[in-house]
A protein has these predicted regions:
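Conserved redox-cofactor binding core of oxidoreductases
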Residues: 15-137, 206-230
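FAD cofactor-binding and catalytic pocket of flavoenzymes
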Residues: 208-328, 365, 370-379, 388, ...
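Periplasmic solute-binding protein
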Residues: 1-16, 174
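Glycine-rich loop(s) and the adjacent beta-strand/alpha-helix scaffold that form part
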Residues: 24, 130, 139-232, 239-240, ...
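A glycine-rich dinucleotide-binding beta-alpha-beta segment and adjacent secondary-structure elements
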Residues: 97, 122-133, 263-274, 281-288, ...
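Conserved, non-catalytic sequence blocks in retroelement Pol enzymes and Pol-derived host proteins
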Residues: 56-60, 318-325, 355-356, 416-418
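Active-site-proximal substrate-binding core of FAD-dependent oxidoreductases
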Residues: 186-207, 344-358, 435-449
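Internal hydrophobic alpha-helix adjacent to the cofactor/substrate pocket in enzyme cavities
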Residues: 71, 185-187, 332-343, 426-441
């Protein structure tokens, strides 16, 4: 639900490093603006007429206030709008919410189109292969309720399987690294060595602290409180049941050498433990720290014993020493933030990872054992024009006519933000490319770095 666009230098970096001049930030910004229906104050940075409901989170909780105040006390800063001219510091996060409900891409774009006569939605289907006639994509094969079905494409096949399933499907269709396909007994059709490579994600570490005060979120599992929150939501569309919990966060720099924020906070006014598959809410608060631009990259490969099974995924988190050192800095930054006076009335003992991890080497050992995914896989069918690129600047797969990939896999490098907003922007641009419409005019606004 978090709506964060990414930094200007992310997109300008795509343009400069991967020969993608049309992907500069000023070319992307008009699509961000056009796509959103922002529920806050009018701004040249924000859109009011789009389909995607966006609002700044506003559930009142004193721990959110403490978090923001600690940002100013620590020198980590404060931003009024992380999607505006100053995307650095701590802030209340933007979320894709409309009328107290999550506003997803399906809510905003798919559901309103389901009645169209030229659209058929088939769910719970498993796509098996892209059909090729020479070097032209002509359809797909999928299974649905035990039946194997072939669909021919009128113009193009557009693959939107995500950073894991898109490269898998390309490889099942003979498009990918030739030697790996042969190892899986798949006839190579097009040798694209970059398919499944360059896998990137935001690595994450969670810090959790006991709260000396018991606050409303800490009692949310109480049946009476659940009922109360549900009734309040049904009557008003607001309250605790309309919150996504992670309503505050920030973008910060761990050191002065980085060009733009390299760490992201997500702050929640509760803690939790998981036992036997059940979540127990704790009287605590949580601070997630995500690494925005890791140097480590992984890969997606088919399972040679059965390529149609789930692929083999190796993120290789912390494989590059730079990433491990940066995440050590992240732990120190997060602890410094929580040590500020604003948290004094709330801060109890550090529950996770625990204050027994003090030295750099102790923290490195802890990170190796406890690093988590932020669930932002990307970059496995990346755009570009070098030998390892899979798609071009208009999402077309190199060497194949009538085949595009439109999802997070085409990012040349992961952006410094949650992927929700960037992917919706990219999909909007893809629609114009596919239909042959001109791209929206660039928007040039003053931007603080």
């Amino acid at each position: 639900m978090v709506y964060m666009r990414g930094h200007r230098l992310d997109y300008d970096g795509w343009a400069e490093e991967f020969n993608l001049p049309e992907w500069r930030f000023n070319n992307c910004l008009p699509y961000f603006i056009a796509g959103e229906q922002y529920q806050g104050d009018a701004s040249e940075w924000r859109g009011k007429t789009g389909r995607l409901g966006v609002k700044q989170a506003d559930y009142p909780d004193p721990l959110y206030d403490a978090f923001l105040a600690a940002g100013e006390q620590s020198g980590q800063g404060r931003s009024q709008d992380l999607n505006g001219a100053n995307p650095e510091g701590l802030a209340r996060l933007d979320c894709t919410v409309a009328n107290g409900k999550r506003c997803s891409a399906a809510t905003a774009h798919l559901k309103p189109a389901l009645s169209r006569p030229n659209l058929t939605l088939i769910h719970s289907a498993d796509t098996q292969q892209i059909l090729l006639n020479g070097n032209k994509a002509q359809g797909v094969v999928f299974t649905h309720r035990g039946e194997r079905i072939t669909i021919n494409a009128g113009r193009e096949v557009i693959l939107c399987g995500g950073a894991i399933n898109s490269p898998k499907l390309l490889m099942l269709s003979g498009i990918g690294p030739e030697n790996h396909l042969k190892d899986c007994n798949i006839k190579p059709r097009i040798h694209l060595p970059g398919v499944g490579q360059n896998l990137q994600d935001h690595a994450k570490i969670r810090l959790q602290f006991e709260s000396k005060k018991r606050l409303p979120f800490h009692s949310i599992n109480n049946p009476f409180n659940k009922l109360k929150a549900g009734i309040n939501w049904m009557l008003t569309g607001g309250g605790m049941a309309a919150s996504n919990i992670w309503e505050a966060g920030g973008l910060i720099r761990s050191n002065s050498d980085v060009t733009h924020p390299n760490l992201q906070y997500h702050f929640g006014p509760l803690g939790f433990t998981i036992s036997n598959g059940k979540i127990k809410v704790e009287q605590a608060f949580s601070l997630n720290v995500d690494q925005m631009r890791p140097k480590s990259t992984g890969e997606i490969k088919l399972n040679p014993s059965d390529p149609y099974k789930s692929p083999m995924i190796n993120f290789r988190y912390m494989n590059d020493p730079y990433d491990l050192n940066e995440m050590v800095e992240a732990v120190y930054m997060a602890r410094d933030l929580v040590s500020q006076q604003a948290f004094d009335e709330f801060r109890g003992a550090e529950m996770k990872p625990g204050d027994q991890f003090k030295s750099e080497e102790e923290i490195k050992d802890m990170l190796r054992a406890n690093i988590e995914t932020a669930y932002h896989p990307s970059c496995t069918c990346r755009m570009g024009y070098d030998d390892d690129a899979v798609t071009d600047s208009e999402f077309r797969v190199h060497g194949i006519e009538g085949l595009r990939v439109v999802d997070a896999s085409v990012m040349p490098r992961i952006v410094s933000a949650n992927l929700n907003a960037p992917i919706q922007m990219m999909a909007s641009r893809a629609a114009d490319f596919i239909l042959g419409r001109p791209q929206l005019d660039p928007v040039n606004l003053e931007y603080s770095t």
